Design a protein with these regions (language model features):
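Hydrophobic faces of alpha-helices used as interaction surfaces
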Residues: 2, 6-13, 17-42, 46-49, ...
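Amphipathic, membrane-inserting segments
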Residues: 48-162
Length: 162
């Protein structure tokens, strides 16, 4: 059941990143408690990979990126409106967060959104097939100690994923 929830969750995140960020919040409120443990394993790996590839800055974290994506998305700043991932990231970084709104967004929603954004960035940066980051998410969730950030980053950069 947890794998089904993770798969559904990541699929929802990828769709939401591409279309409507509100879907992320809805999904996370429904399934977040069930996949919280898995998110705790996935998030640090995605964060380390995204930072190593320069997708997010050293002092940024997945949850903050997710919070920005959700709030900016509600204001019309959507990934699909940008031809380059870096331009989108600049836009959400410049977006003024509402601290009160941040308090109302669950950590699961922020984390799911941040993982989705990082995944889309990985796909663009490394010319990966669309939505391939979903498979990466499942690999990490299945065994985060084996599929750690160093191992996954090496595979991604070499193009030789087993």
């Amino acid at each position: 059941m947890i794998w089904s929830a993770i798969t559904s969750g990541f699929s929802a995140v990828c769709s939401a990143v591409s279309s409507a960020v509100s879907s992320i919040s809805s999904f996370a409120m429904t399934y977040g408690p069930k996949i919280g443990e898995a998110l705790g394993k996935i998030s640090p790996v995605f964060q380390a990979i995204a930072q190593a590839l320069g997708l997010i800055k050293p002092k940024e974290n997945i949850e903050e990126i997710g919070d920005r994506a959700i709030q900016a998305g509600e204001a019309g700043i959507q990934l699909e409106n940008y031809s380059k991932f870096d331009d989108y990231m600049t836009a959400i970084r410049e977006f003024r967060l509402d601290p009160e709104k941040s308090k109302t967004i669950s950590e699961a929603s922020k984390t799911l959104a941040g993982i989705g954004i990082a995944g889309k960035g990985l796909e663009e940066k490394l010319n990966l097939p669309v939505d391939s980051s979903g498979i990466l998410t499942l690999m990490i969730a299945s065994n985060a100690s084996f599929f750690n950030s160093d191992r996954v980053l090496t595979w991604l950069q070499s193009g030789q994923i087993p």
